């Protein structure tokens, strides 16, 4: 449906939109769902992210998708009956090398078969539908049996389905807080000078006041929202802006009316409302302290201590901490662009952390509840050695760290650098900048910041801290952990459905296997359930890997409205909380309007807690860094949960089972997610190449153009040239959801800008100097 199937359904409905009245959820032009009253169209790929051809193997049924000569499907051939069409009609160039070979083997056995177009096209389409239906029914049945949740009825993606399962079956009370829209501080609009006065009162009188500068404005039980409130003394603090409260001294003509507002904005009305509000607060028994804006400004002129205090507030009255600023992705880059083993004892090894994110979800600590907010000067009393939570601060990196610790978003990428200015300028030379130019401001998870400090980062200023209580799994007692119940449930299912390991052939070996697994994971396997079940294993793996990302989803996602009435379009344009992005005509009666809301105005979803998402990715980066730190300059490449490195006898290596790349001989990379290597296959006794390039499908045709040799030639020669791959018949949808076929070309070139290049194909972080 995301591809183009949904386009046919939608355009048919839009031809008679008054009858169908479809509502759509989309991601750009990709259709996620179409709903018409009680009928809902959803995408199986949103739940089962695999090709239809692997459904039979995954869900263990006998049908096979088979092959069809798509290019033979022309009007001239609709009544064709004869020999099987030639290979050129089967789009063999668009297949992987393995798929292509399977097709060649099959085609060679069909010499005597008769191909009747009118029957074969129906048979192929029916088999597609049959496989899809059987796979989806089995998936839904397994999901409901295991989770008591109907994925297709109660969610639109596997991620939302996982979140629903967690909240229904595993979420403990009072553990995950819903972060208020706009955060905890300065979300209530209050003038900067009002915050300064409230902070001065806190400082000079040593009282704790709740106000918008560090949390939300307090609403007293009588329903009145006040500027500040001290619980201990039952005191309300009100800052009276002269303009908004009708100050008689500053506005002696009390009949003045703001021409942009209504008659009720006359100064005397504002003054009377202020007096009445003050009387009401006192009547309710509150101590009331008021400060007029003009009085406070006069006080600042004569009170030097107050002026110094306001000056020293500094950046705490700037933008509040945004937890999304601490939500960085995985760490991906090449630290050396080419390496060939010396042919004697050196090897290139590929280490992959098995199930990194499920491991993090189970064993690592997570924030619970709502944080205590510390701002500005308050942060000086907080120890960075022990505080848990998110920290907004200015840091100065060391100048000689080969693998920097802290991330920084720059140039649309996640960078790890030692000088902010070198990063901005992409300076390929040695850094000559001052400390002020090298330092940068960021928001970090406390654990990642502590790791940075241990690697000689200096914290120059701390602007704000969200201090959380933590929940963590105890390996000794096998108790606790925010997500351990969820992870254990599906880890158990996955392990049981994998069957017995090959070395478990006797009852004693099976018993020891169960005991060892319990000792390691705290999960007691049921020997009666240990049998191969590829469908359930696939489901368990999906539930483990698709779980955590929902916590970091953006709240303000683009929305699409189907508009057939001019008044509805005008309403969208005049709504101050709507930002229209695009308008695409569908026909004479209907347009599609894509829109979103201003920053901070999105819906506060109950499935989202960005602090949890930030902790998840920070823990994953720290796990990867534990290997980078020890491997040092032997690292060639890393990507979120894997690392490729050089090893000689006696060198430190991560503890693990068999290495995927124990016999890698030669490695080359042209940038992040852009690498290739030659590996010796012991099973085939031959040298094989693996090549990965983000954004380009390396099918049979494209792999003739982009492969180990061409990538190596470009890197070794530092080529500025480009390679191009072509697809003569790319099926796409346009902005009006028409499905068309058109030629497509993609450009490939060396793109390396996350570190600076030096001799011998090595690299250094921007800002590095000995």
Segments the model singles out, each with a brief description of its role:
Residues 232-292:
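Basic, amphipathic alpha-helical patches used to engage nucleic acids or provide basic targeting signals
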Residues 200-236:
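Active-site metal-binding core of divalent-cation-utilizing nuclease and nuclease-like domains
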């Amino acid at each position: 449906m995301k591809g183009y199937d949904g386009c046919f359904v939608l355009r048919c409905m839009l031809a008679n939109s008054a009858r169908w009245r479809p509502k759509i959820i989309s991601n750009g032009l990709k259709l996620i769902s179409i709903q018409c009253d009680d009928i809902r169209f959803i995408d199986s790929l949103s739940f089962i992210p695999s090709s239809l051809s692997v459904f039979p193997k995954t869900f263990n049924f006998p049908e096979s998708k088979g092959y069809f000569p798509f290019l033979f499907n022309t009007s001239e051939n609709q009544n064709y009956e004869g020999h099987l069409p030639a290979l050129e009609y089967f789009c063999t160039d668009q297949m992987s090398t393995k798929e292509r070979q399977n097709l060649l083997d099959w085609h060679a056995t069909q010499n005597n078969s008769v191909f009747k177009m009118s029957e074969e096209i129906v048979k192929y389409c029916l088999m597609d539908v049959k496989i899809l239906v059987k796979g989806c029914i089995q998936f839904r049945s397994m999901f409901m049996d295991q989770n008591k949740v109907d994925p297709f009825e109660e969610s639109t993606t596997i991620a939302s389905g996982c979140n629903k399962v967690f909240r229904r079956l595993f979420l403990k009370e009072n553990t995950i807080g819903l972060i208020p829209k706009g955060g905890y501080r300065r979300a209530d609009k209050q003038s900067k000078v009002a915050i300064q006065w409230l902070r001065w009162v806190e400082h000079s009188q040593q009282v704790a006041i709740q106000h918008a500068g560090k949390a939300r404005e307090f609403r007293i039980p009588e329903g009145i929202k006040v500027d500040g409130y001290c619980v201990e003394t039952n005191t309300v603090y009100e800052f009276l802006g002269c303009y908004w409260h009708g100050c008689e001294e500053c506005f002696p003509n009390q009949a003045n009316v703001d021409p942009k507002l209504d008659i009720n904005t006359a100064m005397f009305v504002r003054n009377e409302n202020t007096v009445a509000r003050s009387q009401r607060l006192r009547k309710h028994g509150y101590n009331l302290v008021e400060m007029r804006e003009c009085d406070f400004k006069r006080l600042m002129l004569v009170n030097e201590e107050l002026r110094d205090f306001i000056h020293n507030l500094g950046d705490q009255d700037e933008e509040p901490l945004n937890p999304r600023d601490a939500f960085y992705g995985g760490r991906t880059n090449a630290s050396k662009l080419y390496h060939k083993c010396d042919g004697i004892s050196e090897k290139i090894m590929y280490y992959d952390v098995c199930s990194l994110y499920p491991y993090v979800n189970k064993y690592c600590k997570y924030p619970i509840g709502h944080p205590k907010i510390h701002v500005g000067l308050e942060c000086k009393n907080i120890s960075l050695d022990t505080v848990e939570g998110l920290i907004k601060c200015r840091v100065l990196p060391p100048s000689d760290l080969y693998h920097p610790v802290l991330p920084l978003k720059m140039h649309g990428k996640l960078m790890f650098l030692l000088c902010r200015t070198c990063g901005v300028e992409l300076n390929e030379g040695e850094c000559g900048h001052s400390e002020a130019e090298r330092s940068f401001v960021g928001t970090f998870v406390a654990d990642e910041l502590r790791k940075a400090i241990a690697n000689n980062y200096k914290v120059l200023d701390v602007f704000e801290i969200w201090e959380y209580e933590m929940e963590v799994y105890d390996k000794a007692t096998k108790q606790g952990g925010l997500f351990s119940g969820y992870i254990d449930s599906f880890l158990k299912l996955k392990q049981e459905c994998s069957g017995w390991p090959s070395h478990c052939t006797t009852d004693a070996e099976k018993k020891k296997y169960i005991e060892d697994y319990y000792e390691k994971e705290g999960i007691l396997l049921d020997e009666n359930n240990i049998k191969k079940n590829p469908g359930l294993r696939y489901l368990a793996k999906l539930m483990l890997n698709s779980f955590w990302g929902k916590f970091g989803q953006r709240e303000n996602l683009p929305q699409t409205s189907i508009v057939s009435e001019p008044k509805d379009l005008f309403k969208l344009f005049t709504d101050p909380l709507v930002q229209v992005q695009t308008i695409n005509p569908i026909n004479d009666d209907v347009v599609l309007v894509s829109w979103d809301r201003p920053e901070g105005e999105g819906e506060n979803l109950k499935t989202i807690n960005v602090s949890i998402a930030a902790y998840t990715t920070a823990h994953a980066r720290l796990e990867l860094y534990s290997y980078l730190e020890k491997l040092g300059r032997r690292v060639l490449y890393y990507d979120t949960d894997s690392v490729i490195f050089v090893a000689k006898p006696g060198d430190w290596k991560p503890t693990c089972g068999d290495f995927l790349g124990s016999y890698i001989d030669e490695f080359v990379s042209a940038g992040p997610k852009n690498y290739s290597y030659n590996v010796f296959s012991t099973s085939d006794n031959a040298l094989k190449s693996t090549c990965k390039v983000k954004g380009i499908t390396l099918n049979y045709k494209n792999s003739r153009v982009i492969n180990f040799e061409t990538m190596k030639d470009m890197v070794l020669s530092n080529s500025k040239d480009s390679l191009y791959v072509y697809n003569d018949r790319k099926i796409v949808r346009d902005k009006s959801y028409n499905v068309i076929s058109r030629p497509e070309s993609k450009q490939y070139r060396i793109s390396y800008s996350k570190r600076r290049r030096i001799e011998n194909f090595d690299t250094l972080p921007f800002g590095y100097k000995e």
